[in-house]
Amino acid sequence: MKKCRGRPKCPRRVEQTPDITYFKPRGVPLSDLEVVSLTVEELEALRLVDIEGLRQEDAASRVGISRRAFWEDLKSARMKVAIALSKGKAIEIKGGNYIRAESSDINEDADT
């Protein structure tokens, strides 16, 4: 099934980028694992709601997108993390389309 193309995603404001970008099951070489890719803005959605305890509406405002777009990012992030944890896959955090909150530089990665 072909994915529908709609409006391009607008950049999200991200306050924290991760220092550590890989997580994997212990005792299994990375070369033997399937990898799930989580974008920086998906990680930010998880951080704002699940760690900082913000409501989705407040988190969406902080990131600079609609509540619906934020919900899609959060849903995607939770699904990817759940799949990786339940199926023993590695998680790589990379890419996306975001702006660092304290700068106006856009980091756009076409791979996502």
Curated annotation (Swiss-Prot):
Gene3D superfamilies: Winged helix-like DNA-binding domain superfamily/Winged helix DNA-binding domain (1.10.10.10). InterPro entries: UPF0251 (IPR002852), WH-like_DNA-bd_sf (IPR036388). Belongs to the UPF0251 family. This is UPF0251 protein MA_4245.
